[in-house]
Amino acid sequence: LVTSRKQKLNLKSQSNLSTSTRLYLNHPNLWSADSPYLYHCVTTLLVGNEKITMTQSNFGIRTLSLDPVNGLQVNNKTVKLKGGCIHPDNGLLGAVNIVDDLNRKVQLLKSAGYNALRSAHNSMSPELLEACDRYGLYVIDEFADTWTQSKTYFDYSVFMDNQWADDLQSMVLKDYNHPSIILYSIGNEIPETGTNESAFWAIKFIDKIRSLDQTRYITNAINPTLSNMDKLPQITESLKTEIPEKNINDIMHDFKKLMPVINTHPITSEAISESADLVDVVGYNYAAARYELDHKDYPNRVFIGTETNPRDLDNTWKQVVD
């Protein structure tokens, strides 16, 4: 037992009461991916000497800081995030959360040299978060894959307008006591991030998150090319480049060669600037070409590679380290 406290409360019949208390630890063991030390908290409600209910939870103690010079710091030490995106990948297991399976998954990722995970593109389950707490993985928890513009039939865009506040609150309250959570992502490859509509929704989401949790940072996983699909004719015209009519494989090959140019084009930079400025950390999907550009043109901007091609890992990791 490292610390304890009793608190007296008077509660009227048929009424509700919220309260808080503080406990102090001298020289606590700090949580990090390298040393995932967890404390166990037991809260018991007594009426007289009779135990009415008891809850138990684990938590970790650590600090976070962020700036363009030192990047992300955990417990005052700079951390380079090397991670992956977890999509629904349980195969035959389906959507059920099996603790042993999740523990195995996290341990395999740790043994592969990863220190971070991003939930793609929905909020992470409590069971997976507990595994990340236990074995030491930093987590980017993601809110949604769509806002108002749909990507497929009957996706979240159908419900977003009425559901976003409740869903964001559920995510943040679920995550709050997990030391592995370092970033909230408000979206993945949202088409609106290249439009004036982006700020309207992003500000709502950011304000809601910060009303519930001011201890974590906020990002948005932006794919600059997908954010500017409506501007591609203007961009390609300025480059005096056209994508000729070929079979689909040749077209995709040519388009991939153009993506770095599109991602760093002044039209693209201007279109995503408002979305980028609203968050603490800009998330870039498949936009490693912007890393050096952002350091030069936006020296106060902090960014993270939220999705990159696995085949480019050596090159992108070299950019991170350098």
What are these regions (language model features)?
Residues 1-131, 135-139, 167, 182-183, ...:
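Secreted/periplasmic carbohydrate-active enzymes, especially glycoside hydrolases
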Residues 107, 116-322:
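Substrate-binding/catalytic cleft of secreted carbohydrate-active enzymes
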